[in-house]
């Protein structure tokens, strides 16, 4: 009788695990916007980011990168990292940007909209603890002062390409 009970509990656990795994696998598609819509939003942001870069001083710090190759690996695999990186751009970078002019404000609004849409597509348990790579990035960003804003904005195309690859890899 005890063996029968243990087998039933085990079967129930296996069934629940499979159901949860299937839900997590399909969570991108069920509650998500059409990928074409997200991809078009990223393409539109590429164009607006190029315009935004043209309105700020050129990034002259060539020996420092905020978005490194290992950062890309984390972005592609870790949803908490994705959320923290997008928050860094929204709060730290755009929060310090002098938003004069409708186009700059519109860019930030569009970026925020994309961030919200992505958060609907990629379900992730939030973490109160900041990841080390984000902490390091913020330390560099604030250490170089206003030039940190120029650096981050000059690397927007890198971030947007990562978002595009993330969308493509989840198809």
Curated annotation (Swiss-Prot):
The entry's keywords: Cytokine, Secreted, Signal
Biological process annotations from GO: cell-cell signaling; immune response; negative regulation of epithelial cell proliferation; positive regulation of cytokine production; positive regulation of ERK1 and ERK2 cascade; positive regulation of phosphatidylinositol 3-kinase/protein kinase B signal transduction; positive regulation of receptor signaling pathway via JAK-STAT; positive regulation of stress-activated MAPK cascade
Induction note: By Herpesvirus saimiri infection.
GO cellular component, one term: extracellular space
Compartments (UniProt record): Secreted
Predominant location category: secreted
Reported function: May play a role in local mechanisms of mucosal immunity and seems to have a pro-inflammatory function. May play a role in inflammatory bowel disease. Activates STAT1 and STAT3, MAPK1/3 (ERK1/2), JUN and AKT. Induces expression of SOCS3, TNF-alpha and IL-8, secretion of IL-8 and IL-10 and surface expression of ICAM1. Decreases proliferation of intestinal epithelial cells. Is inhibited by heparin.
Protein name in UniProt: Interleukin-26
């Amino acid at each position: 009788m005890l063996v029968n009970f243990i087998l039933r509990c085990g079967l129930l656990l296996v069934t629940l695990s499979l159901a949860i795994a299937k839900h997590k696998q399909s969570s991108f598609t069920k509650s998500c916007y059409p990928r074409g819509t997200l991809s078009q939003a990223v393409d539109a942001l590429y164009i607006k980011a190029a315009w935004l870069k043209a309105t700020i001083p050129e990034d002259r710090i060539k020996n420092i990168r905020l978005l490194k190759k290992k950062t890309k690996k984390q972005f592609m695999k870790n949803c908490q990292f994705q959320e923290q990186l997008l928050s860094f751009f929204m709060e730290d970078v755009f929060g310090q940007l002098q938003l004069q002019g409708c186009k700059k404000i519109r860019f930030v609004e569009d970026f925020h909209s994309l961030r919200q849409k992505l958060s609907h597509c990629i379900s992730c348990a939030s973490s109160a603890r900041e990841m080390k790579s984000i902490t390091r990035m913020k330390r560099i960003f604030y250490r170089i002062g206003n030039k940190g804003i120029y650096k981050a904005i000059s690397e927007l195309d890198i971030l947007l390409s990562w978002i595009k690859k993330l969308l493509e890899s989840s198809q």
